[in-house]
Amino acid sequence: MSITPQEALQRTIEHREIFHDEMLHLMRMIMRGELSPVMTAAIVTGLRVKKETIGEITAAAQVMRELSRKVAVADTTHLVDIVGTGGDGANTFNISTCAMFVAAAAGAKTAKHGGRGVSSKSGSADVMESLGVHIDLPPEAIARCIADTGIGFMFAPNHHPAMKNVAPVRKELGVRTLFNILGPLTNPAGAPNILMGVFHPDLVGIQVRALQRLGAEHALVVYGRDGMDEVSLGAATMVGELKNGEITEYEIHPEDFGLAMSSNRALKVETPEQSREMLLSVLRGEPGSAREIVCLNAGVALYAANVAATMADGIARARAALDSGAALARLEQLVARTRALAAGG
């Protein structure tokens, strides 16, 4: 079923849904650059104002997946993405990136999909680059990296070439749109398990249901009540969990895992270099709130990856991976492997 751009815009003005097949058609036109920048901007702004439905988000994500450059991972057992929508304004160091190394050292395979900082001081690509990781590998090299080190980093612009058709509109609008919530739904490696942080409480239920429709196996969508798009140490965290096809929604608290509640102020950074130093301090085993929040998020990721039976078990495994030096060693392996692959090795 097709819909004209003008009809779609009128629907958003009237706060009416664009149905699944219509959204597929509309999104393909947008991603192929068939609409003018003015019409694209009007439609994505209209969707934002009326609030995107689960069906609209799911259809848009399907099109982005369809047009992406995929990473073929042979064995997706324990494969997990740790990702956030961004836009929480917290400007913390790269917690999910640090948690990725810890989770990989504790038995998960991590396929992280990220880009440069837009709303934050340091995006995952910025800090990975500052750590010496080669982020511009082709899909087949990333698949080898996951097989060899348990970690693959997918630089989003390399895997979503069609995004170039909407990038100028996004930049000029300068506000959150549908595309901010699509990125975490479109992992090019098809990770069946995911820990996703979101920037608004309403997105917990929306994103976990979109993941359900998109075929995810074990997903946890989280929102820290202090505004963080991570599992938070500073407040309760809302959780939407998809497991065995069923969705449950609940809250978790740092105290549930024997962790002291603490402010996020000590986690803030101004530059990718500061984020790099804080991340390295955690991997080197230094104590403090940065270590605690990484253990918390890595532990939940290990639960999402079905490596740990419970979140508490995951946190214990995360601590052990840091204490043994295995997490730092995993970073060093990734740097060496990506450089070798970039050189053709």
Swiss-Prot record:
<comment type="function">
    <text>Catalyzes the transfer of the phosphoribosyl group of 5-phosphorylribose-1-pyrophosphate (PRPP) to anthranilate to yield N-(5'-phosphoribosyl)-anthranilate (PRA).</text>
</comment>
<keyword id="KW-0808">Transferase</keyword>
<dbReference type="InterPro" id="IPR036320">
    <property type="entry name" value="Glycosyl_Trfase_fam3_N_dom_sf"/>
</dbReference>
<dbReference type="InterPro" id="IPR017459">
    <property type="entry name" value="Glycosyl_Trfase_fam3_N_dom"/>
</dbReference>
<feature type="binding site">
    <location>
        <position position="96"/>
    </location>
    <ligand>
        <name>Mg(2+) 1</name>
    </ligand>
</feature>
<dbReference type="GO" id="GO:0000162">
    <property type="term" value="P:L-tryptophan biosynthetic process"/>
</dbReference>
<feature type="binding site">
    <location>
        <position position="84"/>
    </location>
    <ligand>
        <name>anthranilate 1</name>
    </ligand>
</feature>
<dbReference type="InterPro" id="IPR000312">
    <property type="entry name" value="Glycosyl_Trfase_fam3"/>
</dbReference>
<keyword id="KW-0479">Metal-binding</keyword>
<feature type="binding site">
    <location>
        <position position="230"/>
    </location>
    <ligand>
        <name>Mg(2+) 1</name>
    </ligand>
</feature>
<comment type="similarity">
    <text>Belongs to the anthranilate phosphoribosyltransferase family.</text>
</comment>
<feature type="binding site">
    <location>
        <position position="92"/>
    </location>
    <ligand>
        <name>5-phospho-alpha-D-ribose 1-diphosphate</name>
    </ligand>
</feature>
<keyword id="KW-0822">Tryptophan biosynthesis</keyword>
<feature type="binding site">
    <location>
        <position position="230"/>
    </location>
    <ligand>
        <name>Mg(2+) 2</name>
    </ligand>
</feature>
<feature type="binding site">
    <location>
        <begin position="94"/>
        <end position="97"/>
    </location>
    <ligand>
        <name>5-phospho-alpha-D-ribose 1-diphosphate</name>
    </ligand>
</feature>
<feature type="binding site">
    <location>
        <begin position="112"/>
        <end position="120"/>
    </location>
    <ligand>
        <name>5-phospho-alpha-D-ribose 1-diphosphate</name>
    </ligand>
</feature>
<keyword id="KW-0028">Amino-acid biosynthesis</keyword>
<dbReference type="Pfam" id="PF00591">
    <property type="entry name" value="Glycos_transf_3"/>
</dbReference>
<comment type="pathway">
    <text>Amino-acid biosynthesis; L-tryptophan biosynthesis; L-tryptophan from chorismate: step 2/5.</text>
</comment>
<comment type="subunit">
    <text>Homodimer.</text>
</comment>
<feature type="binding site">
    <location>
        <position position="124"/>
    </location>
    <ligand>
        <name>5-phospho-alpha-D-ribose 1-diphosphate</name>
    </ligand>
</feature>
<dbReference type="InterPro" id="IPR035902">
    <property type="entry name" value="Nuc_phospho_transferase"/>
</dbReference>
<feature type="binding site">
    <location>
        <position position="84"/>
    </location>
    <ligand>
        <name>5-phospho-alpha-D-ribose 1-diphosphate</name>
    </ligand>
</feature>
<protein>
    <recommendedName>
        <fullName>Anthranilate phosphoribosyltransferase</fullName>
        <ecNumber>2.4.2.18</ecNumber>
    </recommendedName>
</protein>
<feature type="binding site">
    <location>
        <begin position="87"/>
        <end position="88"/>
    </location>
    <ligand>
        <name>5-phospho-alpha-D-ribose 1-diphosphate</name>
    </ligand>
</feature>
<dbReference type="GO" id="GO:0004048">
    <property type="term" value="F:anthranilate phosphoribosyltransferase activity"/>
</dbReference>
<dbReference type="InterPro" id="IPR005940">
    <property type="entry name" value="Anthranilate_Pribosyl_Tfrase"/>
</dbReference>
<feature type="binding site">
    <location>
        <position position="170"/>
    </location>
    <ligand>
        <name>anthranilate 2</name>
    </ligand>
</feature>
<keyword id="KW-0328">Glycosyltransferase</keyword>
<feature type="binding site">
    <location>
        <position position="229"/>
    </location>
    <ligand>
        <name>Mg(2+) 2</name>
    </ligand>
</feature>
<keyword id="KW-0460">Magnesium</keyword>
<dbReference type="Pfam" id="PF02885">
    <property type="entry name" value="Glycos_trans_3N"/>
</dbReference>
<keyword id="KW-0057">Aromatic amino acid biosynthesis</keyword>
<dbReference type="GO" id="GO:0000287">
    <property type="term" value="F:magnesium ion binding"/>
</dbReference>
<dbReference type="GO" id="GO:0005829">
    <property type="term" value="C:cytosol"/>
</dbReference>
